A protein has these predicted regions:
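Active-site cores of enzymes that catalyze phosphoryl transfer or operate on phosphate-rich substrates
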Residues: 123-268, 317, 321-382, 394-496, ...
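Extended, hydrophobic alpha-helical segments in both membrane/secreted and soluble proteins
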Residues: 242, 269-280, 293, 297-298, ...
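Single conserved hydrophobic/aromatic residue that forms the stacking wall/gate
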Residues: 2-7, 12
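Catalytic binding pocket for nucleotide-activated donors in carbohydrate/polymer assembly enzymes
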Residues: 397-447, 585-586, 593-735, 739-744, ...
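An amphipathic, hydrophobic-aromatic interaction surface with interspersed Lys/Arg
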Residues: 61, 84, 98, 239-319
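Glycine- and acidic
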Residues: 53-64, 217-232, 256-268, 276-285, ...
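Catalytic or ion-translocation cores adjacent to nucleophile or general acid/base/metal-coordination motifs
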Residues: 91-92, 99-104, 108-123, 290-335, ...
């Protein structure tokens, strides 16, 4: 391959994808597939008695991300390289990631994920690109000879940012992009002078500052120190990445006014949006530009992807923390805000409500999404429904002011990892029927449609699914000690644990089914294996209690011989990309049951679809577009619509007690949270979950994610699934049609839309002579 690492000396437009997370997964197998060498390497190793899959298992999952945000970033990098575009991913080289999850006595316990303990072969340290990052101190203003004010940050602490490049190999095209993850080092390792004075903390202060910056992803921010560390992390990698980008630009170009022609900074969610003010700072203070010049450049270089509909997830910083840690950056944000508020008041006189909603600085907070929208030349949502809700609801005021900025880019996934690598049996079957072009053009799988009713193709598909279920069942036996039946329905929900994703509704339904079987042992019921996988944020009490509930329900049900194994419940510990590939391949039912209007897009739904699982979901996020692609007969939709949910929220007319008091099955299940059934008679263990469903909590309404409202519709949809699965031919037809209609959901399509509409990139010209 050519070690192009973003085209090396090529004077093409670069895209810097800034993200707090990159959930890459293991690199060896994926790189071999993209190099077209997997089969040859596998055969060569077998000749000397080695198993490539065993070798792959020795590689740790890089602990650089947690959930869908990070996995999307990884898919995008794969697609950028495969499509031949120059790109850097920009993030942090976390030493311990978020955490490694252990389940002890049913509870989640967080331990460090020491993925770097044995080194990592797929990274290259680049000390020649070292930059100073400053925190704290104060700003001194001086009048220069040119008569203009000059600003200098003094009395600060600083660290050095040093990048590690991880290669992102394009499929079959000799292009290698780079994931540039930043490590922090102290400017001074150890202060002997401070140590000799007995000030031992001061002696290692620089070292501690650097180490803390890159220890963990998303440190707990339930306290001031945690908030400070998160903000420092964000500024650290953003500042370093911009400094690197400008150095690279100036190596090839003389005029920084041309920066927008050659560089785009895509801000993945609100975490990197301090990039707006940092780019301004460098242009103003280090390059000597006027405000108008710097603003013109910045507002044509930065673009923002919004990933959430929920207002509480739009990042805000207390002004006092922001100002103390980033004094010069804060001054610039303050000036951006002052000018923007003037615009608002000029356009909407006597409308302070507009100012309240749209100002960057308001009520003691720095609103990072507002900063990104004001400065960004593009603001995109990640599914059509999500973007519509942003435009009509959450960001309506901004959309009215800047309609030209808003656009939709429905998320996608890379078929190379999640089919070619993750499910080789199915990948070979697809290739046998439609050729291998699907690997770089997923739309080609539409040709599978004609095989959906073919009995031979159906039987082949079902046998492949069975083999993948056997593989996962073996893993579950080895890691969980639970025997599961590969002939049962594998019903799967694997994703970040959050109340709006409604893992609680799923496990309540399992409890409901268990009650039904206990009361009616002879009832017609197709055996189910319910598989969960999720990490809860360390400080998220309700989410962690949900994990405990899932595990205690599993203990009760799995050890009850009276139900003859009709239900099994499994919680996959430390859910991560490498095991996710096996889970997607084995799933029959894909649970995508978020409260309508809350999930921006989702990408797990697409991975299941690509692997021939049938979706059980709400009309939320990308489920809506999946429904349109695959048709109503091949997906199980239930529950309230986004409009209905939003209407209830606006009118405050939903009372979960109305359902609780009028549905005895629901009442029984909810009461079991506090009657000791699943808690060894500890009636308080799940009281918090019980209260969240029925009693308003800390200013929040009861059952804010409408679990009880949707429960009966969910149970009915599950019942239909049980009946439908018994018709293996019909099930296989629907599963094959799901694969056939997954073409839209390739990240290749998504990235090409970003390129065409936002980034305007040119493809890398690769000279393959001698390769």
């Amino acid at each position: 391959i050519m070690p192009s690492l973003v085209g090396s000396e090529m004077c093409i437009r670069d895209r810097y994808y800034m993200s707090m997370e990159f959930l890459m997964g293991r690199a060896l197998g994926n790189n071999l597939i993209n190099l077209g060498a997997y089969g040859e390497v596998k055969e060569a190793l077998e000749e000397i008695g080695l198993d490539l899959s065993v070798i792959e298992d020795q590689e740790p999952d890089p602990a650089l991300g947690n959930g869908g945000l990070g996995r999307l970033a990884a898919c995008f990098m794969d697609s950028l390289a495969t499509l031949g575009y120059a790109a850097y991913g920009c993030g942090i080289r976390y030493r311990y990631g978020m955490f490694k999850q252990q389940i002890i006595d049913g509870f989640q316990v967080e331990v460090p994920d020491n993925w770097l303990k044995d080194g990592y072969p797929f990274e290259l340290r680049r000390p020649e690109y070292c930059y100073e990052i400053k925190f704290g101190g104060h700003v001194e203003e001086t009048a220069g000879e040119d008569g203009n004010l000059h600003f200098e940050q003094v009395g600060y602490q600083s660290v050095l940012a040093i990048p590690y490049d991880m290669p992102i190999v394009g499929y079959g095209n000799h292009v290698v992009d780079s994931l540039m993850i930043w490590d922090a080092q102290p400017k001074e390792e150890f202060s002997l002078d401070s140590f000799d004075r007995g000030d031992y903390d001061q002696a290692v202060e620089q070292e501690n500052l650097a180490r803390n910056l890159v220890e963990v992803l998303y440190p707990n921010d339930n306290h001031v120190k945690g908030k400070e560390l998160r903000l420092k992390q964000q500024y650290f990698f953003v500042s370093a990445s911009i400094q690197r980008a400008l150095e690279r630009f100036k190596k090839h170009h003389n005029d920084l006014h041309d920066l927008p022609k050659k560089v785009t900074f895509q801000m993945n969610d609100t975490h990197p949006t301090v990039a707006v003010a940092e780019l301004m700072r460098i242009l103003l203070d280090e390059e000597g530009m006027s405000w108008d010049e710097a603003w013109e450049i910045t507002t044509h270089c930065v673009a923002y992807t919004n990933h959430t509909i929920m207002a509480e997830a739009l990042e805000k910083w207390p002004i006092d923390i922001f100002q103390r840690l980033l004094p010069r950056v804060y001054q610039i944000v303050d000036e951006i805000n002052r000018r923007f508020v003037e615009e608002i008041r000029a356009k909407y006189p006597d409308n302070e409500e507009k100012v309240r909603k749209m100002a960057i600085l308001y009520d003691g907070q720095v609103k990072m999404a507002n900063l990104a929208i004001v400065a960004g030349y593009s603001v995109n949502g990640v599914a059509r429904l999500h973007t519509e809700i942003l435009e009509k609801q959450e960001l309506r005021d901004f959309y009215e002011l800047f309609p030209e900025k808003f656009n939709n880019k429905t998320n996608g996934i890379t078929q190379r990892r999640f089919l070619a690598h993750g499910n080789p049996l199915l990948a070979d079957w697809v290739t046998k029927h439609v050729g291998k072009d699907w690997i770089t053009s997923l739309a080609k799988v539409e040709d599978l449609t004609k095989y959906a009713t073919d009995p031979k193709a159906q039987q082949e598909f079902l046998e492949i699914k069975k083999q993948n279920k056997i593989r996962l069942a073996k893993y579950i036996k080895e890691h969980n000690g639970i025997e599961v039946d590969p002939d049962s329905i594998f019903d799967v929900q694997v994703k970040r644990l959050h109340e709006y994703k409604r893992q609680l509704m799923n496990i309540l339904h399992v409890m409901y089914l268990y009650n039904q079987i206990k009361e009616n042992p002879g009832m017609d019921f197709y055996p189910r294996t319910f598989i969960f996988g999720a990490k809860a944020a360390a400080g998220y009490r309700t989410a962690k209690k949900t994990i405990k509930l899932i595990n205690t329900v599993a203990d009760v049900i799995n050890n009850d011989p009276s139900i003859n194994g009709k239900i099994k419940v499994v919680f996959i510990e430390d859910y991560r990309v490498s095991i996710a590939e096996w889970i997607f391949a084995a799933a029959d039912v894909s649970e995508q049951i978020s409260t309508a209007s809350k999930e921006a897009s989702g990408t797990g739904n697409m991975k299941f679809m690509l692997n021939g699982a049938i979706t059980l979901g709400t009309m939320d996020g990308a489920n809506v577009e999946m429904y349109e692609e695959v048709g109503a007969d091949n997906i199980f939709i239930f529950g309230m619509s986004a409009d209905e949910v939003i209407a209830h929220e606006q009118h405050h007319d939903y009372n979960p007690y109305d359902i609780y008091n009028n549905d005895e099955d629901i009442k029984k299940v909810v009461n079991q949270l506090v009657d000791g059934t699943y808690s060894h008679n500890d009636r308080e263990l799940f009281r918090e979950l019980y209260n969240s469903l029925l009693n308003p909590q800390q200013g929040q309404v009861a059952d804010r994610y409408f679990i009880l409202a949707d429960f009966r519709a969910y149970a009915n949809a599950q019942k239909k699934i049980g009946v439908y699965y018994t018709n293996k031919s019909a099930w296989a037809k629907s599963a094959i049609l799901n694969i056939a209609h997954s073409g839209k959901f390739s990240s290749d399509r998504t990235i090409q839309e970003y390129v065409d509409d936002i980034w305007k990139l040119d493809k890398i010209e690769v000279n393959t002579e001698g390769c």
